[in-house]
Amino acid sequence: MAASSSSFTLCNHTTLRTLPLRKTLVTKTQFSVPTKSSESNFFGSTLTHSSYISPVSSSSLKGLIFAKVNKGQAAPDFTLKDQNGKPVSLKKYKGKPVVLYFYPADETPGCTKQACAFRDSYEKFKKAGAEVIGISGDDSASHKAFASKYKLPYTLLSDEGNKVRKDWGVPGDLFGALPGRQTYVLDKNGVVQLIYNNQFQPEKHIDETLKFLKAA
């Protein structure tokens, strides 16, 4: 790395001094960027790292920020297949409170904790007269294996393609790279009374919804 010297004059009242000023050439820091894509799994989502990062568009940010289903609004109906492949409509549950929770994926650490926490408190939800329903983008076969392995006593619905998630405006995390974890409590008339979002403390969803149901 080459260097050159120059000088400048410093005036201090009656004393004049010439000080050397060292001029250094700075080169750009070299760092490697992976040219091949690499993948890692994070809470059920596959994140891809490559040398190209696409900018976040304003339209995608709008989808992340603004919910389409809000508190006080009648929840839009939908029909999805359950873990046994049978079609289930949301309107089927009118007349009783419904705890509807969207989660990223079956068999991931956070989602398994959440599912088992709902299982362990299922009798408390039943005592409150509420039905518990889980929704993710996994297919019915995945849900069946997941429910069987962990002995889940409630319904899991398959939202392949995430259509219902998008229709409801469930916000994602990490700029949409990670499917959001959001729970809705509907009253017996199908009106949204509580919306709770907490990606990284999945078991808090059970605490907050039970607290709300007991106070209602």
Swiss-Prot record:
Annotated ranges, domain Thioredoxin: 69-216
Superkingdom of source: Eukaryota
Induction annotation: Highly induced by oxidative stress. Down-regulated by salt stress and by ascorbate.
Reactions mediated catalytically: a hydroperoxide + [thioredoxin]-dithiol = an alcohol + [thioredoxin]-disulfide + H2O
Tissue specificity as recorded in UniProt: Expressed in all tissues at the exception of roots.
EC number: 1.11.1.24
InterPro entries reported for this sequence: AhpC/TSA (IPR000866), Peroxiredoxin_BCP/PrxQ (IPR050924), Thioredoxin-like_sf (IPR036249), Thioredoxin_domain (IPR013766)
Temperature notes for this entry: Optimum temperature is 40 degrees Celsius.
Compartments in which it is found: Plastid, Chloroplast thylakoid lumen
Keywords: Antioxidant, Chloroplast, Disulfide bond, Oxidoreductase, Peroxidase, Plastid, Redox-active center, Thylakoid, Transit peptide
Primary location class: plastid
Cellular component, GO annotation: chloroplast thylakoid lumen
Disulfide bonds: 111-116
GO MF term (any one): thioredoxin-dependent peroxiredoxin activity
Pfam family, one: AhpC-TSA
Active-site residues annotated for this sequence: 111 (cysteine sulfenic acid (-soh) intermediate)
pH dependence: Optimum pH is 8.0.
Function, in words: Thiol-specific peroxidase that catalyzes the reduction of hydrogen peroxide and organic hydroperoxides to water and alcohols, respectively. Plays a role in cell protection against oxidative stress by detoxifying peroxides. Involved in the photosystem II protection against hydrogen peroxide.
Subunit architecture: Monomer; Interacts with the plastidial thioredoxin CDSP32.
More details: The active site is a conserved redox-active cysteine residue, the peroxidatic cysteine (C(P)), which makes the nucleophilic attack on the peroxide substrate. The peroxide oxidizes the C(P)-SH to cysteine sulfenic acid (C(P)-SOH), which then reacts with another cysteine residue, the resolving cysteine (C(R)), to form a disulfide bridge. The disulfide is subsequently reduced by an appropriate electron donor to complete the catalytic cycle. In this atypical 2-Cys peroxiredoxin, C(R) is present in the same subunit to form an intramolecular disulfide.
UniProt record similarity statement: Belongs to the peroxiredoxin family. BCP/PrxQ subfamily.
Annotated protein name in UniProt: Peroxiredoxin Q, chloroplastic
Native source organism of the sequence: Arabidopsis thaliana (Mouse-ear cress)
Gene name per UniProt: PRXQ
